[in-house]
């Protein structure tokens, strides 16, 4: 590299000075370049070529400047571009950006041209065949593994100014993605299976290039006779055809890539039904109650117990009925036993797989004896519910129209049930077919069928029992309709 940019000014504008095409990086088309400082998409005109640009010395290495080319006055050419920055590097492209020079020269800066040189080489190769009016550019189709030094030069009609050069070479290499394991949500807690069921775990992971995946069981290598593992580019599958309790434990997946690694642990628990309680004992029997005690099972099925189920059976019927479910203590009292019966009891253990296949049953029976009880009845005074008749709702006065049946109502309360008598103008009307008397649940009704003005008068309802005979009166007026 050299600080003199004048010998390369004409080289950067000449398309014939590039080396063999296979080694020249391809710049991004001008239509795809982000020109933050340019005034349009048009390319800047080429700088005026000096007569000395045709000198073969212009194609020599930057370290040997041409002696026949006069240098342009420093106040005419622009200064070096500012803030030359490498924005992005991938496996086949790179993007650089820069700021316009602080001093544009007396002629003014017209465009930028930039060039590259491979690490270890001495000749700068123009990247863009013509100067461009942009401050950012992307070069594509780069060879994997190459290293480049980059520089950018401001150009105007007076020539090229001093270049801005990147301090470090740019290495075109394959992008490495750190390995990462994505454990499915249902495997973040203990994965529970029953004995005999299959275990099929698919764990996705990320990493580029393809990482190496390996499994361990409780810190040891897997038993290839029981466990099958298949690892692909994006996931690893662990398969156990028929799980046994010995397969329980912590399985750890390790993904390694170029000195980086990621680990994920999965806890697997293989369970089965528990055994029955070790023993059961009938502690005591009193009244209609029986006390029981038992010992926990020797085999819990490789998991915690959810409790015990206690059942009772009458000796006469032999049918079992559940008394307690998922009961945690190992002692209980069974109540509400029927006097005169004999009972036996049994206890099951229960875990996530269900109840134990067998139960522990008491050897002796619990006899509920009938105690001798002498009844001593207390004196009882019978209550007198007798009540004289009383009208809770008297009969109301009414006005009726001739030819339309009307009804009189009242309600009476009495014990014993009273006899109801209806009267008109103090004369009994019992048995008269014109009147219909009904008494039901204390409600007394007198229906007068198609009354006429002759039926007007004072009606009386009398209730009679052994305790009294009160009466209530009302006035009925039957008015003839007006004629026109």
From Swiss-Prot:
CC terms in the record's Gene Ontology section: M band; myosin filament
Record's keyword annotation contains Cell membrane: no
Residue numbers bearing the Phosphothreonine modification: 2, 6, 26
Domain annotation Ig-like C2-type: ranges: 179-267, 389-479
Tissue expression summary: Skeletal muscle.
Recorded superkingdom: Eukaryota
InterPro entries named among the record's database cross-references: FN3_dom (IPR003961), FN3_sf (IPR036116), Ig-like_dom (IPR007110), Ig-like_dom_sf (IPR036179), Ig-like_fold (IPR013783), Ig_I-set (IPR013098), Ig_sub (IPR003599), Ig_sub2 (IPR003598)
Domain Fibronectin type-III: 80-175, 276-371
GO biological process: cell adhesion; sarcomere organization
Gene3D superfamilies linked to this entry: Immunoglobulins (2.60.40.10)
Start-end of Low complexity biased regions: 41-71
Keywords recorded for this protein, A-Z: Cell adhesion, Immunoglobulin domain, Muscle protein, Phosphoprotein, Repeat, Thick filament
Entry similarity comment: Belongs to the immunoglobulin superfamily. MyBP family.
Functional note: Binds to myosin; probably involved in interaction with thick myofilaments in the A-band.
Protein name stated in the entry: Myosin-binding protein H
